[in-house]
């Protein structure tokens, strides 16, 4: 049984090398690039990846395209800023060699913020269904955070691996804010597409406050120190921004209709 690693990327030269080096042992690496202007594609080719170029259609469709171009019996889906540790690699190899293995496996994830593992506040173990038999996984859910699920026609039983992958998405505050700006915009567009039109004091002020209080105090985010404080504070800002952008989108559409 072989393993394909599926990755989508754009301008990820700062992290893609470490990610690809961690899975060089895989039988195949498929990287779909959506127009990088840095060295992402060059680094990927140097690491032995098969690089495919495709304009960005959205995360679900781009990941699906990567899956479709995998040729091995098993697929491991990774983000461009995730690393497979040696212990996790050994566990994955054990799964794909097992003839009685299930159709999919959840992998815990260590999320790093400013270089620190955030163990509390709901950020760990953060399990993701990332390892699955080829042809049996499908992207589902709305942008900006769609997920992998098993296709309904297959056995839905899944397993859980013990060793976490490492997710180093936010090495700086600037990188975190840039990601959250993108996510809040995508989340707002998805909400408006579903018909959400609300604008309220609750959404803009109270919902972010409640999010901070719940994650920082009740889910023990304060145990992550200063990094935990900043993470949950700016996550609350993200929530407020998303609902403000929903209002902005609906206001713009209303103005356009009114002027037509």
Residue ranges and their predicted role:
Residues 2-4:
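Cell-envelope/extracellular polymer assembly enzymes that use nucleotide-activated donors
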Residues 7-28:
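Short, well-formed alpha-helical segments that are part of the catalytic scaffolds
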Residues 14-17, 38-47, 87-88:
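Acidic helix N-cap motif at the loop->helix transition within catalytic regions
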Residues 22, 33-42, 79:
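A conserved acidic beta->alpha catalytic loop
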Residues 25, 70-73:
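Active-site acidic short loop of glycosyltransferases
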Residues 34, 54, 72, 79-82, ...:
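Short acidic donor-binding/metal-coordinating loop in glycosyltransferase active sites
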Residues 54-70:
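Glycine-rich, basic loop-to-helix element that forms the pyrophosphate-binding segment
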Residues 64-67, 74, 85-253, 260:
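Catalytic-site signature of metal-activated, phosphate-bearing donor transferases
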């Amino acid at each position: 049984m072989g393993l394909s690693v599926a990755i989508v990327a754009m301008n990820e030269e700062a992290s893609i090398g470490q990610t690809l080096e961690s899975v060089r042992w895989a039988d195949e690496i498929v990287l779909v690039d959506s127009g990088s202007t840095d060295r992402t594609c060059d680094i990927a080719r140097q690491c032995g990846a098969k690089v495919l170029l495709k304009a960005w259609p959205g995360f679900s469709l781009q990941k699906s395209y990567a899956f479709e171009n995998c040729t091995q019996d098993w697929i491991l889906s990774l983000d461009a800023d995730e690393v497979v540790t040696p212990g996790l690699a050994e566990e994955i190899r054990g799964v794909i060699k097992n003839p009685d293995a299930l159709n999919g496996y959840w992998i815990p994830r260590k999320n790093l913020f400013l270089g620190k593992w955030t163990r509390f506040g709901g950020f760990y173990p953060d399990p993701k269904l990332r390892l699955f038999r080829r042809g049996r996984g499908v992207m589902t859910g709305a942008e900006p955070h769609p997920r992998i699920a098993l296709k309904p026609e297959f056995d839905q039983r899944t397993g859980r691996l013990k060793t976490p992958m490492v997710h180093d998405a936010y090495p700086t505050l600037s990188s975190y804010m840039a990601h959250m700006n993108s996510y809040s915009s995508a989340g707002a567009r998805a909400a408006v597409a579903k018909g959400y039109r609300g604008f309220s004091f609750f959404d803009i002020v109270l919902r972010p406050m409640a999010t901070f209080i719940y994650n920082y105090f009740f889910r023990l985010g304060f145990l992550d120190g200063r990094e935990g404080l900043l993470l949950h504070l700016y996550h609350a800002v993200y929530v407020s921004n998303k609902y403000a952008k929903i209002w902005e989108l609906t206001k713009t559409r209303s103005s356009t209709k009114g002027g037509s």
